[in-house]
């Protein structure tokens, strides 16, 4: 379902992360976009790909594309959410760099600190050669229900922020 300001459907959680990556891929000139599956049911593919990408391309940082929850501090329509922490804590120097670039971009964003939840970043952080990573996602209401809802402006901000960061990191 679509209204003037929102898109609402089931299973938008993972789909929005993929949609974001595909939109960024349309204009990306230099970077890697990597899709993995099975992470919520055992994992392992992220760490395999991480070793290959780091060895071949010397990449050691990642942006994790997904959604986050609309909460008291993360507002619907307030811009893409940059997570300073979920079940893991990304390296402060990398978080600070991303926030600095986000401010320079003039793209609407909001900061969040999650008390729970997580992402595939665990595989990146716990690896033999850890990467810098940060989770950035559009705030979603009614997560994991048939009525997941995201503000269109937050989706646009998410796509724009990823494109900007991929160019400037």
Where are these regions (language model features)?
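Acidic/histidine-rich catalytic neighborhood of metal-dependent amide-processing enzymes
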Residues: 1-10, 15-85, 117, 121
């Amino acid at each position: 379902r679509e209204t003037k300001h929102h898109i609402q459907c089931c299973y938008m959680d993972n789909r929005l992360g993929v949609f974001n990556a595909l939109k960024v891929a349309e204009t990306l000139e230099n970077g890697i976009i990597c899709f993995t599956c099975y992470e919520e049911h055992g994992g392992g593919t992220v760490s395999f790909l991480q070793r290959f990408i780091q060895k071949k391309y010397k990449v050691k940082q990642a942006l994790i594309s997904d959604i986050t929850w609309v909460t008291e501090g993360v507002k619907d329509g307030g811009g893409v959410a940059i997570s300073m922490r979920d079940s893991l804590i990304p390296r402060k120097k990398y978080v600070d760099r991303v926030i600095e670039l986000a401010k320079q971009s003039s793209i609407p964003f909001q900061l969040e600190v999650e008390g729970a939840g997580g992402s595939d970043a665990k595989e990146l952080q716990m690896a033999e050669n850890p990467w810098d990573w940060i989770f950035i996602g559009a705030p979603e209401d009614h997560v994991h229900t048939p009525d997941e809802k995201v503000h269109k402006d937050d989706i646009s901000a998410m796509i724009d922020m990823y494109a900007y960061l991929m160019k400037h990191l």
